[in-house]
Curated annotation (Swiss-Prot):
Cofactor(s) in the UniProt record: FAD
Gene that this sequence comes from: mnmC
Highest classification ranks of the organism: Bacteria, Pseudomonadati, Pseudomonadota, Betaproteobacteria, Burkholderiales
Compartment annotation: Cytoplasm
Role this protein plays: Catalyzes the last two steps in the biosynthesis of 5-methylaminomethyl-2-thiouridine (mnm(5)s(2)U) at the wobble position (U34) in tRNA. Catalyzes the FAD-dependent demodification of cmnm(5)s(2)U34 to nm(5)s(2)U34, followed by the transfer of a methyl group from S-adenosyl-L-methionine to nm(5)s(2)U34, to form mnm(5)s(2)U34.
Protein name: tRNA 5-methylaminomethyl-2-thiouridine biosynthesis bifunctional protein MnmC
Keyword Cytoplasm found: yes
Recorded family membership: In the N-terminal section; belongs to the methyltransferase superfamily. tRNA (mnm(5)s(2)U34)-methyltransferase family.
InterPro entries: FAD-dep_OxRdtase, FAD/NAD-bd_sf, MnmC-like_methylTransf, SAM-dependent_MTases_sf, tRNA_MAMT_biosynth_bifunc_MnmC, tRNA_MNMC2, tRNA_S-uridine_synth_MnmC_C
Catalysed reaction equations from the record: 5-aminomethyl-2-thiouridine(34) in tRNA + S-adenosyl-L-methionine = 5-methylaminomethyl-2-thiouridine(34) in tRNA + S-adenosyl-L-homocysteine + H(+)
GO molecular function, one term: flavin adenine dinucleotide binding
Amino acid sequence: MTDPLIPAVLVFRDNGTPFSPLYDDIYHSAVGGLEQARYVFLRGNSLPDRWQGRRIFTVLETGFGMGINFLMTWAAWRADPLRCERLHFVSTEKHPFTVGDLRKAVAATISDPEIAALAQALANAWPTLVPGTHRLEFDEGRVVLTLVFGDAQERLPALRLRADAFYLDGFAPARNPELWTPMIFKALARLAGEGATFATCSSAGDIKRALIQCGFEYRKVDGFGWKRAMLVGHFAPRWRVRRHEPPAPLAVDERHAVVIGAGLAGCAVIERLAARGWRVTSLERHASVAQEASGNPAGVFHPMISRDDSIASRVTRAGFLYTLRRWAALERLGHAPLRGGQGLLQIAADENEARSISEAIAAFGYPGDYVTPVSAAEAQRLAGMPLARGGWFFPHGGWIDPASLCAAQCAAAGPLLERRFGVDVARIERSGGQWTVFDTSGEAIARAPVVIVASAHDAARIAGLQHAPTRSIRGQLTLLPPGAVLPPLQMPVIGEGYAVPLADGVTLTGATYELDDPDTSLRADGHLENLERVAQMLPAFANVADPARSTALTGRVAFRCVTSDRMPMIGQLADEAQAALDAQRLRGAWPLDLPRTDGLYGAFAYGSRGLVWAALGAELIASQLEGEPWPLERDLAEDIDPARFLLRALRQGAVS
């Protein structure tokens, strides 16, 4: 179970130095935090020289604290005309500051106006204090900060990245010994790229021994300020110290990808690849974007709360928070999708659920800007009409027009995107490092070194997957005209069903959930089912749940694509043919052991959570493709890996 995130407590010593009472240690040298960062970590890792001429450079830090090392690294990157194209800075933090305390800490420490401006940008982007991985982007996405909130002993082994430099900057080993254990250094060794360097203020004997045991070489140099010595060094193992190599970028002659499908999944991939400079060809069988399940007039987005903080809850939390940042970035670029005001209510199924979920919210320590339990009276005030029960309020949840989101993402891709509609893809073939896409007439219609299949129900067929058990679920929506329910609903309400007040006064309700039902026609019993379920939450809707009136209602039918475990299929696809040949050897395999198909990725089976999964899924695929740090923990990525069903079949001896 996920441990609650406990924020740092900020106090200041008499000399003004930020201090942690939890660890009885200072956050930076009293001689000067900026100078310490420059001397110990930048100079200690030979930066900026080592990133010059590189496309991607990745720094991994243990202990973000108040972010001074990141700010100084960012400033050095900005000042270097030979800087790398994209700087990744990944940092763990068990006790992050609240944004208010972060502002206080940097205000007391930083007088340099350039660094202060960067600190202000960091504070403005500071994530919600919930456990997990939070990816922030600065300088048009060329500087990427990935904050990993939680215990480093648990979080470092869950990272998937190739580090070029390590900043070992936890509190002193005597104050915070858990951050200097052999387990930590083993985790770092697993993540070290070729020639990776490190620097640390400490020169303790235990640390030296742990470094050597894990494949690092060190040397002692003059320390900073009152410290007599510090350690610097590099990764130079004399024997194999890890089972799997860190991720590397796909070697391609041309940065060009074909994306099959232009719904929520495909358009998110288009935007994330184009943001990295990839040329993208979009193939869509319909006449425009978002024509199938992504074409509903509105969709709701919100986190998922569970008593045990399940895998689905963790993936959805990461996706929800990342999605909000991506949408805000689109809006800053002038590509604003149509969405409602902030706020969404989830109504408990009964009093027992209301109590247990409220207890879970308290136990996990979720902050009020993420979720808040509400009574029936409080929920009624927010919704503007009576409710059957209380539940919980998501202040940043809401509704959005999916088609407008897809259009905004394509617009953000600009001239790097070629869009082709009315194209019905039948199959793909790989030869000579290139994928060729064929239509249903057998004609080759596109070629590229990379293909991302984001076509929902057709994805497994196009990719030739045998171990991708997806199914179709029919969903019928019901639209109520303005004034059908009074007083009007003020925000989306979800629970057994959902009701969404749209911008034009129409209220959207839904949706039915009918497995393997291919009927595309609107059905009166479907409208009635939707309204009756909503009426269980919102009694005012009982007046419109009338069988005699249901035949006159309008709506829409769409089909969700889901897997048997209800998790999406996101990431590089396995080479199933090669896995079958190696089935005996792979029977006890882990996901990283599986053979993968070069240049072939999937983004499908999003079910009813496409709005909160698509952006994160696209970022994961782009990161895998580029050899960048993954935007979520490895165990979560494995739970949405398209190869997970192949892996289960191998373990059961069902592949031959």
